[in-house]
Amino acid sequence: MMSSSSSEIDVVKTRIPTYDEDDNTVLYAYETKPEFVNKELNIVSDASCNTEEQQKTVNDVLIHCQVIYDAMQNLDKKIDVIRRKVSKIQRFCVKSLWTNRKRYGYKKYSYRLAKKLKLKKMKKNEVYESFSYPESYSPTLPVSRCENNSPSNFPRPSFCMEEYRRAEPEEDPILSRTPSPVHPSDFSEHNYQPYYASDGATYGSSSGTCRGNPRADGIHNTYSTDHASAAPPSVTGSLFGNDCYIEEGSITKHPSTWSVEAVVLFLKQTDPLALCPLVDLFRSHEIDGKALLLLTSDVLLKHLGVKLGTAVKLCYYIDRLKQGKCFEN
């Protein structure tokens, strides 16, 4: 009979009988126990289940890591975009700063320039306010200034009326026969010297000669509207270097009604040094008040041969006459 014996726990050892009696060889057959086979299958199945679970867990972890990596990549991209925008803003600010930057000392320079212009304007206004009517416009023809009794320090933006002051010259053999006192003329802008007429002079004429009074040339007088309206025209004259008299009645209220001698008187009293050389010229051309108001610089320069400085000054005085509002009709 076959005898079976187990040498191991999971293996069944069975002796196989031989038919040769002389041979001492012993044969055994080994078989695995069924229980062990079932147990091994269970172990393998459990191991496979555990492996699948681990693989699933690993896959989940890898998926989460990939998500985190993608999020970090997106953050890096956004950070790069923000950095580029910030750098662009910084470059724009620096560029605008350098473009609109004022030069060194620009503020101080502009302040000085504005102050300089303001001072220049103030000086110009002061010069205009302190403008004296007999002002020279020619560098070769200076104008004498009145120092003591001339009211030239007052501002004259327009024609002004000042009180007429009578002069009291020394007695002269020729002038002592003048019966009437000095009366103001109707011309209100310029400073006239007092003048006297001889007995031979009549109203409306400029005839009569006399010798000049040296003290009468330095006296400058103006008059007010009250004196002008109250004083009747009298037979008085003005004393000049050509030893002739001009009656006061020939100088009327408006320049357009002046006679030739009244225009000559205007030239001599306005600016003696600059305009006295034009006396003979005006007399030769018989320029009266209307012609005086129509004179221009071109006519003076081209047709009358007057120098530029003298023409400029005369045109200025004529413009002052045209703009005057003190003449009453």
Swiss-Prot record:
* Source organism of the structure: Nomascus leucogenys (Northern white-cheeked gibbon)
Which Pfam families would you find in this protein's record?
SAM_1
Which residues does the UniProt record annotate as the domain SAM?
Answer: 258-325
Q: What residues bear Phosphoserine in this entry? A: S138, S238
Q: Which domain of life does this protein belong to?
A: Eukaryota
Q: Which GO terms describe its cellular component?
A: nucleus
Q: Under which name does UniProt file this protein?
A: Sex comb on midleg-like protein 1
Q: List the disulfide bonds.
A: none
Q: What is the lineage of its organism?
A: Eukaryota, Metazoa, Chordata, Craniata, Vertebrata
Localization: Nucleus
* Keywords tagged on the record: Nucleus, Phosphoprotein, Repressor, Transcription, Transcription regulation
Q: Does the keyword Transmembrane apply?
A: no
Spans traversing the lipid bilayer: none
Q: Is rRNA processing found in the keyword set?
A: no
